[in-house]
Curated annotation (Swiss-Prot):
Record-linked CDD domains: Histidinol_dh
Protein name: Histidinol dehydrogenase
GO term, biological process aspect, one: L-histidine biosynthetic process
PROSITE patterns attached to this UniProt entry: HISOL_DEHYDROGENASE (PS00611)
Length: 424
């Protein structure tokens, strides 16, 4: 793992993967096919891309029951407890509608309304993460969304992984559909005979899913276009190098393009961590993926001081930030840009991925400078409420008309003037 002495500013930001022309054209063609042919396109494309010859898209109750039989009790219990923790955290994010009445009788306020429907994309195969179902479904449920649809590509035998089905069932999601890729996004956006159109699409996916989400955005809402996973560890000389190496590798195994970075003022710690990473890599099942990530996107930045290390962290604006230093809570006020902040030696990043409660759908590619983790607010709309009294209009009408005429909008001004004239 390369060790770099910090001289200039650093950045995790990369060019967003907007796909090749061929990929973009393929996605637009798939979307058009789904809009024109509906379910028939989904069956055709699922056979073409996933090798599954389906006669129905909807997961049946018998399949869910079979999935439960595959699950060991300790895993089922862990899923249940994780759901509890995540729900409890997101319940604290709920907002209420409000109204206020001014002295002149004017009533102003904000009305909170949940979205009618949401579609969650769950990747298939080895990337079929039940934890992502919890993190996307629970804030939507807490927000009050009534209709939640899960789509996921089937395996060649037409099945969906047991972990996905059981987690969805534990959350009470009734509509689970066997369709993936750009065609699933198109179906959620525009609807087919079997797939209900939704108002918002969330969830991770490959480049074709990302391009499809970008293409349908505006017709429906989406969560974000997420990049590869990132972790930055801020550590002082007292930190445990074995813990740091393990946590860096926990993100590196996700993807060859994942970023794993240590920032520290301690050259000795940097060298120990580099050795530990090499040693721990040798026993990882996904060592080839992790090794490529560490080689191409991993680094250890050595700074002069801990204060300089904090500045580097804010420049990086990482998805995940671990603080392994004495009195980690004291750093919290200094961190301005990070998707999730893990404090202390026992707050390893997987604690947040699976169990603690905060959402693991986080901003990447430096976008933590201006965006937030997925949360309950992402599944509601806010409507402004205005009830102007006669007294308020008489007092302020001339000012409103003046502002309208300043902008050259005479009809706006007259809409006010006509009411003022009636009251004279």
């Amino acid at each position: 793992m390369k060790i770099v002495t910090i001289n200039d500013s650093v950045s995790l930001k990369r060019d967003l993967d907007t796909g090749t022309d061929m990929q973009q054209n393929a996605v637009h063609s798939i979307i058009a096919q789904v809009r024109e042919q509906g379910d028939q396109a989904l069956f055709t494309l699922t056979k073409q891309f996933d090798g599954a010859d389906l006669t129905t898209l909807r997961v049946q109750q018998a399949e869910i029951e079979a999935a439960y039989r595959e699950m060991e009790e300790p895993v089922l219990q862990a899923i249940g407890e994780a759901i509890e923790n995540i729900r409890d955290f997101h319940e604290r994010q709920k907002r209420n509608s409000w109204m206020t009445t001014k002295s002149d009788g004017t009533i102003l306020g904000q009305k909170i309304t949940p979205l009618d429907s949401v579609g969650l994309y769950v990747p298939g195969g080895k990337a079929a993460y039940p934890s992502s179902i919890m993190m996307n479904v629970i804030p939507a449920q807490v927000a009050g969304v009534q209709n939640i649809v899960i789509v996921s590509p089937p395996q060649k035998d037409g099945s969906i992984p047991a972990g996905v089905l059981v987690t969805a069932a534990e959350l009470g999601v009734k509509t689970i559909l066997k369709v993936g890729g750009a065609q699933a996004i198109a179906a959620l956006a525009y609807g087919t005979e079997s797939v209900p159109a939704v108002d918002k699409i969330t969830g991770p996916g490959n480049i074709y899913v990302a391009l499809a989400k970008r293409a349908v955005f505006g017709h429906v809402d989406i969560d974000m276009i997420a990049g590869p996973s990132e972790i930055v560890v801020l550590a002082d000389e007292r930190a445990n190098p074995r813990y740091i190496a393990a946590d860096l590798l926990s993100q590196a195994e996700h993807d060859e393009r994942a970023s794993a970075i240590l920032v520290t003022p301690s050259r000795a710690l940097a060298e120990e961590v580099a050795v530990e990473v090499d040693q721990q890599l040798t026993t990882l099942p996904k060592r080839e993926i992790a090794a490529a990530s560490i080689r191409d996107y991993g680094a250890i930045y050595v700074t002069e001081t801990l204060e300089e290390a904090v500045s580097v962290v804010n420049e990086l604006a990482p998805e995940h930030l671990e603080i392994l230093a004495e009195e980690p809570m004291s750093f919290l006020g200094k961190i301005r840009h990070a998707g999730a902040i893990f404090l202390g030696p026992y707050s390893s990043e997987p604690v947040g991925d699976y169990f603690a409660g905060p959402n693991h759908v986080l901003p990447t590619n430096g976008t933590a400078r201006f965006s937030s983790p997925l949360n309950v607010d992402d599944f509601v709309k806010k409507s402004s409420i205005i009830s102007y009294s006669k007294a308020a209009l008489l007092e302020n009408g001339a000012k409103i008309s003046a502002l309208a005429r300043l902008e050259g909008l005479e009809a706006h001004a007259r809409a006010i003037d006509i009411r003022l004239e009636d009251e004279r």
